[in-house]
């Protein structure tokens, strides 16, 4: 029987059909090769937007710098970065007038956070530019290397473990005449393999000391490494993103903490909340505008797009904002917060790996590192690359480019949101002093603008005024990419609003499926995704039931664990059949052991082991939840784990799922090939670092972990904690006298060893 597809939509309100227009199936595009070209594009564009600014030279590094602030007022609609300081300050003042005490209170909250933040805050985050090795590293390793170098250069404030003290070291390091660092290098030699008698290349890792003079050190401290942004859909061209080094990160973190505290108090800010909370916030603003537009008023909404948001932002604007926001605060606080924008005004962008050349005829490939771009003959490059390099040459120093204007992607999301909201705030009638008025929503570079006026001319005038006001602070609303609609239909941060937010369930499609962590986690994540979508995204009961059946099917195919009584032959079926036959209570077998599925949409919140526990054979329970089972290498499992799920749009989201430790929670072993490379020493460092952190967390469970431990070292803190805990346990009879004595002896031994060292 043929079904007329239009019948499917008879009972569905039109806006729900958005899920059927979903274009993003399949994998997103990834970038290959070097990001050097994209970074050059960014640098050249940024300078072009600010080209009428003043050029100066940095006295310390010799880098040429362009300052567009208080530059010429725009005469056309081209994007430009000429923000006017007095306009920015005035916008801040009006924002404070509309929200009395907002800056004062946010500063107090931030000061409290600064006093308590530990330096391990910087181990969060993925790739980080490691200035000691001049390349990217995992955040924890980069931090460890930085601290190691600081200590060997006599900078020891960081030993207190507080982030603010580490930052004192950073500031001091910039005044030093030279810094001694340890770098890794590779030696390659050709040797004959005893077994195969073939020649093989053997790599050995050496560490060598190197001295950096003040200028070289400053350049590295101010460097942002660049990479290509991966997995961006809907774009033909890739673009560059920045990874800052450890010197900048801590300062940025504190500025963003302040800005986050401000954003939380602003009803027009789409950050830092997300999900349903964000939708509620936005719906309120829309409701306010629609209620206030009486029958006589028109209300229109612009789904806005800004041209090159961060390339037109300027660190100097942020410095002005911070100076104003913190104006009545203690000196130390103002200084700490103003360092991030100052560093960004003097930042250097690293050009990445450089260019790859290959000669087809001679089968040769060679890499031209970024350092050589200053001197190499340009005849080897094609037209467009040649133009890029010519433009960038005056800015080059040692393979990095001086990039004073612009912000690089994703650095000051919160603070730039405050700037955007301050312009939305100026739309109140008491400020526009005319018949039109506006309000809206801002989330980093994304905005929605709602304009109310008695007639169409008024709407037009309101939009124009908003547009021009934005120009004055370096925000460029794109007239080509923004569109206007009667209020009630618009899009903001991929949320579609049509008389209420429309659940776009198809956005979540890529996160349905088997994650590939291990059998235990995958089952848990799979059902949690379905549960979350029923709660948040209008996933209906029938569809959810179908999604669940598809997921179980997918899971069985992935792990080859079809039911014990199935006819399907796989590598595992022989073992699973045997298990099926010798199990008395077959209902108790997990799906991954060839059991049947007990999940339905009512019990998705219960981990599978708990769901089937009462139904299991006793010996099966014993095998399944046996931490000494020799066939399983265990992660230590918290009761709640975090998984990263990929929605189709926007960043990967962290999602909590219940973790029950069983023999199915195995961890795959690491690929051995890394052990033969230059990364090996780093890997060992990282593992040692990880072990120390884990040990520390054992002594200080997370509740007491964030409090500063005074000036003692980690070891001292752990020893004193062990003594206190042992005494309490001994006095309450939880441990015997011998055990207590042994613990005390171990503590004394550790202290003795420290003294000898």
Curated annotation (Swiss-Prot):
The keyword Transferase applies. Residues 249-256 are annotated as: Promoter-binding site. Residues 286-483 form the RdRp catalytic domain. InterPro entries: RNA-dir_pol_NSvirus, RNA_pol_PB1_influenza. It is found in: Host nucleus; Host cytoplasm. A motif (Nuclear localization signal) lies at residues 187-195, 203-216. Residues 55-64 have a biased composition (Polar residues). GO terms for biological process: DNA-templated transcription; symbiont-mediated suppression of host gene expression; symbiont-mediated suppression of host mRNA transcription via inhibition of RNA polymerase II activity; viral RNA genome replication; viral transcription. It comes from the Viruses. Disulfide bonds: none annotated. It is an enzyme of class 2 (transferase). It holds the Pfam family Flu_PB1. Residues 50-82 are annotated as: Disordered. Phosphorylated by host PRKCA. Coiled coil: none annotated. One of its GO terms (molecular function) is RNA binding. Gene3D superfamilies: 6.10.140.720. GO terms for cellular component: host cell cytoplasm; host cell nucleus. It catalyses: RNA(n) + a ribonucleoside 5'-triphosphate = RNA(n+1) + diphosphate. The keyword Transferase applies. Keywords: Eukaryotic host gene expression shutoff by virus, Eukaryotic host transcription shutoff by virus, Host cytoplasm, Host gene expression shutoff by virus, Host nucleus, Host-virus interaction, Inhibition of host RNA polymerase II by virus, Nucleotide-binding, Nucleotidyltransferase, Phosphoprotein, RNA-directed RNA polymerase, Transferase, Viral RNA replication, Viral transcription. Its main location: host cell. Influenza RNA polymerase is composed of three subunits: PB1, PB2 and PA. Interacts (via N-terminus) with PA (via C-terminus). Interacts (via C-terminus) with PB2 (via N-terminus); this interaction is essential for transcription initiation. Belongs to the influenza viruses polymerase PB1 family. This is RNA-directed RNA polymerase catalytic subunit.
């Amino acid at each position: 029987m043929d079904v007329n597809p239009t019948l499917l939509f008879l009972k569905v309100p039109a806006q729900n059909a958005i899920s059927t227009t979903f274009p993003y199936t399949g994998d997103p595009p990834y970038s290959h090769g070097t990001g050097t070209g994209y970074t050059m594009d960014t640098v050249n564009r940024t300078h072009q937007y600010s080209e009428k600014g003043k050029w100066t030279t940095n006295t310390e590094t010799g880098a040429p710098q362009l300052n567009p602030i208080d530059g010429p007022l725009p005469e056309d609609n081209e994007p430009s970065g000429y923000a006017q300081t007095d306009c920015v300050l005035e916008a801040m003042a009006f924002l404070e007038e509309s929200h009395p005490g907002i800056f004062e209170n946010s500063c107090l909250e931030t000061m409290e956070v600064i006093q308590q933040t530990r330096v391990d805050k910087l181990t969060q985050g993925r790739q980080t530019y490691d200035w000691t090795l001049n390349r990217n590293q995992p955040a924890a390793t980069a931090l460890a290397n930085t601290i190691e170098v600081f200590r060997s250069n006599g900078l020891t404030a960081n030993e207190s473990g507080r982030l603010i003290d580490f930052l004192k070291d950073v500031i001091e390091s910039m005044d030093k005449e030279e810094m001694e660092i340890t770098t890794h290098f590779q030696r390659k030699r050709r040797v004959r393999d005893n077994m195969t008698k073939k020649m093989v290349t053997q790599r050995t890792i050496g560490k060598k000391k190197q001295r950096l003079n003040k200028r070289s050190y400053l350049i590295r401290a101010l460097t942002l490494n660049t990479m290509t942004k991966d997995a961006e859909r809907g774009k033909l061209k890739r673009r560059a993103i920045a990874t800052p080094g450890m010197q900048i990160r801590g300062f940025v973190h504190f500025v963003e903490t302040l800005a986050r505290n401000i954003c939380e108090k602003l009803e027009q800010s789409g950050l830092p909340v997300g999900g349903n909370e964000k939708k509620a916030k936005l719906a309120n603003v829309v409701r306010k505008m629609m209620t206030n537009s009486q029958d006589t008023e028109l209300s229109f909404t612009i789904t806005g797009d800004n041209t090159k948001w961060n390339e037109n932002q300027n660190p100097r604007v942020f410095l002005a904002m911070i100076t104003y926001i913190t104006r009545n605060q203690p000196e130390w606080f103002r200084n700490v917060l103003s360092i991030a924008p100052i560093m960004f005004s003097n930042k250097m962008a690293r050009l990445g790996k450089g260019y790859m050349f290959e000669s087809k005829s001679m089968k040769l490939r060679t890499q031209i590192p970024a350092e050589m771009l200053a001197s190499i003959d340009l005849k080897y490059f094609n037209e467009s690359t040649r133009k890029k390099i010519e433009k960038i040459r005056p800015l080059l120093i040692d393979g990095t480019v001086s990039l004073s204007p612009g912000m690089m992607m994703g650095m000051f999301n919160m603070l730039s949101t405050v700037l955007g909201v301050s312009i939305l705030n100026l739309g109140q009638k008491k400020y526009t002093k005319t018949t039109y008025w506006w309000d809206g929503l801002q989330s980093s570079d994304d905005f929605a603008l709602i304009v109310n006026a008695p007639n169409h001319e008024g709407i037009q005038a309101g939009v124009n005024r908003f547009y021009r006001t934005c120009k004055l602070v370096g925000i460029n609303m794109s007239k080509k990419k923004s569109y206007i609609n009667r209020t009630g239909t618009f899009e903001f941060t991929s949320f579609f609003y049509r008389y209420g937010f429309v659940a776009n369930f198809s956005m979540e499609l890529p996160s349905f499926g088997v994650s590939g962590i291990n059998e235990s986690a995958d089952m848990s994540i799979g059902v949690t995704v379905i549960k979350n979508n029923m709660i948040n995204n209008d996933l209906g009961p029938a569809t959810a039931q179908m999604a669940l059946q598809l997921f179980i099917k997918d899971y069985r195919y992935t792990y080859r664990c079809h039911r014990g009584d199935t006819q399907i032959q796989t590598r595992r079926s022989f073992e699973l059949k045997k298990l099926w036959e010798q199990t008395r209570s077959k209902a108790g077998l997990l799906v991954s052991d060839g059991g049947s599925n007990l999940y339905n949409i009512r019990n998705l919140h219960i981990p599978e082991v708990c769901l089937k526990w009462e139904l299991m054979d006793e010996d099966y329970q014993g095998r399944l939840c046996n931490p000494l089972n020799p066939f399983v290498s265990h992660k230590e499992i918290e009761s709640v784990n975090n998984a990263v799920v990929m929605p189709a749009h926007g960043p990967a989201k962290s999602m909590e799922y219940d973790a029950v430790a069983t023999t199915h929670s195995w961890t795959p072993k690491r690929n051995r090939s890394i052990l033969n490379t230059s990364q090996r020493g780093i890997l060992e460092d990282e593992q040692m670092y990880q072990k120390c952190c884990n040990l520390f967390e054992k002594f200080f469970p997370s509740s007491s972990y964030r409090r500063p431990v005074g000036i003692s070292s980690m070891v001292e803190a752990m020893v004193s904690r062990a003594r206190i805990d042992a005494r309490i346990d001994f006095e309450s009879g939880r441990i015997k006298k011998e055990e207590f004595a042994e613990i005390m002896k171990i503590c004394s031994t550790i202290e003795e060893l420290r003294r000898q060292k």
